């Protein structure tokens, strides 16, 4: 039995596993990161994690000027709660809490697919020209969006630096980008060494497996690149 996961299990799931006498083992197989993006025309270049928490948890801002940007409406978009992007959001920004229950987030600004997470933010400028949207996704999806027929990343959106560090292959791999993350293979800790699940994990860490990771659009682990 094996599971591919973009984040570690929630505290609740870990407790359920423990109650069932199961210990989970997480084996990192690829790099990824959570990224935030806004309309290309927005002169704002970055936010802090604290500001993101104020936006999505406390609904503290409604204008980009409050976070060092232009005098323009701030329109936050979110993902559906059963998405991998939202799982990272819960872990890294919400601290396993909930989104704000007021403001624009509650008024329907929810993207239910990876593709619409990008197109919704890109189109927000057309429907609300007095403001700029902000949304989030995972880095390697954002980079490969054009090949998945979501032609918005090159000229309609730009990524925001977080705590002064812009997301890139290099800053995600070396961990300096603060929202860097790993993708995991998840096994039972007592999975036998000669089991198919354990052999799959070993393959994913081999040079051949890391090539599969790269072809799938994720970042290969440093130790597997050499």
Q: Where is each model-derived feature located?
A:
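Exported/periplasmic ABC-transporter solute-binding proteins
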Residues: 1-32, 37-226
């Amino acid at each position: 039995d094996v599971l591919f996961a973009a984040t570690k299990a929630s505290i609740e799931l870990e407790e359920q596993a423990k109650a069932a006498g199961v210990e989970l083992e997480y084996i990192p197989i690829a790099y990824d990161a959570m990224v935030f993006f806004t309309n290309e025309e927005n002169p704002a270049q970055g936010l802090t994690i604290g500001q993101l928490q104020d936006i999505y948890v406390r609904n503290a801002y409604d204008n980009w000027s409050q976070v060092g940007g232009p005098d323009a409406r701030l329109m936050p978009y979110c993902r559906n709660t059963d998405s991998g992007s939202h799982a990272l959001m819960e872990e890294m920004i919400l601290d396993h809490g909930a989104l704000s229950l007021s403001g624009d987030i509650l008024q329907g600004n929810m993207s239910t697919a990876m593709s619409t997470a990008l197109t919704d933010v890109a189109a927000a400028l057309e429907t609300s020209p007095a403001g700029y949207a902000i949304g989030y996704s995972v880095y390697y999806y954002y980079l490969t969006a054009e090949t998945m027929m979501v032609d918005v990343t090159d000229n309609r959106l730009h990524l925001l630096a977080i705590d002064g560090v812009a997301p890139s292959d290099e800053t995600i791999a070396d961990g300096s980008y603060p929202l860097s993350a790993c993708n995991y293979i998840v096994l039972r800790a007592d999975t036998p060494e000669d089991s198919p699940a354990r052999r799959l994990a070993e393959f994913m860490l081999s040079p051949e497996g890391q090539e599969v990771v790269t072809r799938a659009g994720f970042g290969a682990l440093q130790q597997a690149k050499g």
